[in-house]
Amino acid sequence: MDGFYPTNLKNAVIYAALILILLFVYGIFGSIYIMHLGVIDAIYYTITTVTTTGFGDIRPITPSQKLFTASLELIGAGFLLYIFTLMLSVMFMSFSEYVTGAKLKRKIASMKNHFILCGFGRVGSTAFKELKKRKQKVVIIEKNKDLVETELWSDPNIIAIPGDATKENVLRYAGIERAKCIIIATGSDVDNLFITIEAKELNPKIWIVARASERENISRLKKAGANRIISPEFSGGKDIYFAAMEPLMMKITVKHGMESIKREAEIIFKHNCTLENIMYHLPEFREPLKRKIEVSDLDHIEKFLFQVKKNPRLRESLNKMYESTSGVHSHWISGPSKENLEKVVEDLKKEGILLGVNLDDEKIKEITRKYGMLAEVMVKPEITVVNKHGIDEIRDEAEIILKHGCTIEDIEYYIPGFREPLKRHVGADSIEDIDKFLNTLKKDPKKYDAIDRLYMLSGGGIHSHVISARSLESLNKVEKELKEKGFLIGVNMSLGEIKEMIQKSGTVVDILVQHDVKNLEDKKTVVKYGGRILTSKHYLPGIRYVLTRKLNLKTMEDVKKCEKELEKPRARRTLTALYELSANIHSHTIVTPSAEITKKIEEELKEKGILLGVNFPEEKIWEMVEKEAVEPFCVD
């Protein structure tokens, strides 16, 4: 590893050499031009005068010669004193550096499961502060020797190495084989890449967090072995810290009252862990309320509890928060090792307050619904309402929500075949916003049809809104009136519950039929019962291609338009070919007002001999088509 030689010592040696050269130039030229000596005698006279060892064989006679000789002797004596002082400094600093280096080496050799931080710039120094706050052991490697010697070494609690982290011997000196994590935060992506490769080779199990200044280098660092890559463009030192601590963090979900706050903290701090935050899981809220804590000693908790005791308003607010969740809340905690975290879990279990470890949001919501009670808290509450109505009743629904001072935040449609709902931001807090939207629909028939189709596809008008309000009372009133109006299906339902309900409702189904192109009985039957045909799908064998036609038939007038369309020769030829290629088998996606009506449509189509089945899987449809198709459709 590079030696620890201060820059000012090197400068002193350079200055001494320059002074010596200038002194000799002055002495030699003065001896030639003032003492009138030859070159050899001038060199001899300069050396003997500067070193004060003159033998008296050459003596100054004139005043100018005497002044020159005196100045040369004075400068020489000063220079010799400077050289003597410099030698003492070198000896002292060499001894000091030996002692410092030995101490540093012993300290690092005794460390294990520590962090190595490469680079102590803006990002690195912030990450270091977060690590020290949590009492983590850190070795810093910094290229800038001045920074290490003047700033970092001034604090006896900081272990820092002046050196290049891209070099193997420097990483070994920092104890890379025994470290649990290396944070690579230098300003050079090239250096960061080399350090990542070197670190992975020296310790394949080490957790690597690397900084990437350029977006295109993120994938390179990932391939090189970095577990997490942080870009200062989007994040900072704190994010690097949390990425570094990821393997040593755990989410605990607990249940206890205010009286057990101190006891819970004692258990966590006893094992040298840090309380990073607290999350309150209110039953009526989509996301938990989060608050940073970032403490690792009991003094902070005791100060907080003293403030709670002293301040009635704070005590009342906190008490309501605990009441509203029945004491259910979560913490992210970090620790020096997995063993420490496991000990915390064991002790919390013994205390009888632990509900689970690293539970996902859905699981915590289940627990919250089980234990949680509604209570007014000093935040803006929100709920998700699942409603069912047609496009013509949008204003009626909005009036109920908005008249109680609530805001419609968004709308979600649940389309069959889609894993996630289609979500659209609304942000309406006045009826004028709704009227403006409805006027746009009236002026634009295409937009109206598109929204109408969405409503029909989404379980015949089933959709959800997140609505927010100033108080829970307002939300309760909205819930009650939506229920009375017949719009409300449920509150805060999960995606699985909504999809299951749509499936059971039987209002959106795919019917598989078989008939020739002139037969429109399937269309007439669906429309007659108030249903709607959204699409028609034809299955072309050979290439196994599904051709989908948008129909959107909702009245007998629409069916008559289909009949007129068939009278046109080109349209008739195209549709006839399509029907024949798929053996007259095709499917329709239909929407009906209720499951009962869907059943009636199915029964009538069966009687007419054209219904093959409902909601068949596509593979089964292909089997039927390919079995019946006389000439498979193919392209040369």
From Swiss-Prot:
List residues of the RCK N-terminal domain. 112-231
What processes does the entry annotate via GO biological process terms?
potassium ion transport
Task: Show the GO MF annotations.
Answer: small molecule binding
Q: Which SUPFAM superfamilies match?
A: NAD(P)-binding Rossmann-fold domains, Putative transcriptional regulator TM1602, C-terminal domain, Voltage-gated potassium channels
Q: Which residue ranges traverse the bilayer?
A: 12-32, 34-54, 75-95
Q: Where are the coiled-coil regions?
A: none
One Pfam family hit: TrkA_N
> What topology does the record note for this protein and the membrane?
Multi-pass membrane protein
Where in or outside the cell is it found?
Cell membrane
Keywords assigned by UniProt?
Answer: Cell membrane, Membrane, Transmembrane, Transmembrane helix
**Main localisation:** membrane
GO terms under cellular component: plasma membrane
What name does UniProt use for this protein?
Uncharacterized protein Mfer_0534
